[in-house]
A protein has these predicted regions:
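General nucleic-acid-binding
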Residues: 1-13, 98-99
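Short, Lys/Arg-enriched anionic-surface-contact patches
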Residues: 11-38, 63
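Short, amphipathic alpha-helical "recognition" segments used to contact nucleic acids or chromatin
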Residues: 32-51
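Short alpha-helical "recognition helix" segments of helix-turn-helix
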Residues: 52-61
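Helix-turn-helix DNA-binding helix
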Residues: 64-68
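Residue-level detection of the helix-turn-helix DNA-binding "recognition helix"
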Residues: 69-77
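Short Lys/Arg-enriched helix C-cap and helix-to-coil transition segments
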Residues: 77-99
Length: 99
């Protein structure tokens, strides 16, 4: 599922998928936002929040587990960031969800 989210963000935001996987460094603010969006969507759409989920998401994005935790806290506390993520979440569900 994380790979589907990365493909969605890559095609929507027009950035290389290798950047979302952490293989290429982020070059500007828009790419940084897309990278963070990929991480938080991976967490929010994960079917079970069990032990090891954050480490799997962090590994697939080549980031620290603490980043996943900080983004989730930001999502919970910042209404602007929450609306930005919720819009992308809705777009993802429209594109990939099966009815």
């Amino acid at each position: 599922m994380v790979i589907n989210i990365q493909k969605f963000i890559s095609s929507t935001c027009n950035i290389p998928i290798d950047m979302l996987k952490g293989k290429i460094s982020v070059k500007n603010h828009d790419q940084y936002n897309s990278y963070n969006l990929s991480i938080i969507l991976s967490w929010l759409l994960h079917p079970t929040k069990k032990y090891g989920c954050k480490s799997t998401i962090a590994r697939l994005h080549k980031c620290n587990m603490n980043r996943v935790h900080r983004l989730h806290n930001l999502y919970s506390k910042n209404s602007n960031f929450k609306s930005f993520v919720d819009k992308a979440l809705q777009d993802y569900k429209i594109t990939y969800a099966s009815n």
